[in-house]
From Swiss-Prot:
Protein family: Belongs to the ScpA family.
Main location: cytoplasm
Cited Pfam families: SMC_ScpA
Function: Participates in chromosomal partition during cell division. May act via the formation of a condensin-like complex containing Smc and ScpB that pull DNA away from mid-cell into both cell halves.
Subcellular location, record wording: Cytoplasm
Keywords, comma-separated and alphabetical: Cell cycle, Cell division, Chromosome partition, Cytoplasm
InterPro entries noted in UniProt: ScpA (IPR003768), ScpA-like_C (IPR023093)
One GO BP annotation of this record: DNA replication
Superkingdom classification of source: Bacteria
Cellular component GO terms held in the UniProt record: cytoplasm
The protein's name: Segregation and condensation protein A
Subunit structure: Component of a cohesin-like complex composed of ScpA, ScpB and the Smc homodimer, in which ScpA and ScpB bind to the head domain of Smc. The presence of the three proteins is required for the association of the complex with DNA.
Record organism: Listeria innocua serovar 6a (strain ATCC BAA-680 / CLIP 11262)
Length: 249
């Protein structure tokens, strides 16, 4: 027979079962009728055993705890002479159990509240961010100064990324291209954009390593001639190439 830990009526453990029994009796959790609760709990465990279900050990531990508390409460009170100067309140055998039940109840209520909030949140849908670059003319955010080291770092990262994505077998064909030709190509790409602006790596798509180097040198020359500028909105953010001058009008 396949063994299984029972989970009747979605009880997650002995404390969950006890809360259910206390709720059925409609009694105060701070004044649990131990005899009645223990009898009902033991009846539940015995029923599971009769059905030949594998009762989880934690249920058996709780059964022993309940029987111990019940026994203590059934013991006759000893009649002693009372010294009112040293009188202390007698500890209730149920105190530790009540404390555990209250703590479990708080966690259960918190879990229920979180689940409700999760269900409520599922009705909300986030809208993907929009590219508003073409609308930001006149409200341009201050850019950080981009150094040659920043550009070299971005260029090296792009080279490594393209090397990882390179096919295992490639046929190399030489194609000479001048820096002037590549400068015109870069300006042409920028001219095609509404705001004359492109992300740095978009200028280097589908090029050989030699072409990448020529494009990078062309970009530096365009910056020197003040035909383009390279911008960065924040440290470690993407670099953007912004066209300038009459060539783009």
């Amino acid at each position: 027979m396949v063994e299984m830990n029972f989970k009747v009526e979605a009880f997650e453990g002995p404390l969950d079962l006890l809360l259910h029994l206390i709720g059925q009796l409609e009694v105060d959790i701070y004044d649990i009728p131990m005899a009645e609760i223990t009898d009902q709990y033991m009846e539940f465990v015995h029923t599971m055993q009769e059905m030949e279900l594998d009762v989880a050990s934690e249920y058996l531990v709780m059964a022993a705890t309940l029987l111990a508390i019940k026994s203590k409460m059934l013991l006759p009170k000893q009649e002693l002479e009372i010294d009112y100067d040293t009188l202390e309140e007698e500890e209730d055998p149920r105190d530790a159990l009540v404390e555990k039940l209250m703590e479990y109840k708080r966690f259960k209520e918190a879990a229920k509240e979180l689940k409700e909030k999760e269900a409520e949140r599922s009705f909300y849908f986030s809208k993907p961010p929009m590219d508003l670059a073409e609308y930001d003319e006149g409200t341009k955010v201050a850019e950080l100064d981009v150094s040659l080291n920043d550009m070299l770092s971005a260029f090296n990262k792009m080279l490594r990324r393209k090397k990882l994505n390179k096919p295992l077998h490639t046929r190399i064909t030489t194609q000479e291209i001048s820096i002037d030709d590549r400068m015109n190509s870069v300006l042409g790409k920028l001219h095609q954009q509404t705001n004359h602006r492109l992300r740095f790596d978009e200028l280097f798509e589908e090029q050989t390593k030699e072409q990448l180097v020529v494009t990078f040198l062309a970009l530096l020359e365009l910056m020197k001639r003040k035909l383009v500028e390279v911008e960065q909105s924040a440290s470690f953010a993407d670099l953007y190439v912004q066209g300038k001058g009459e060539e783009l009008s």
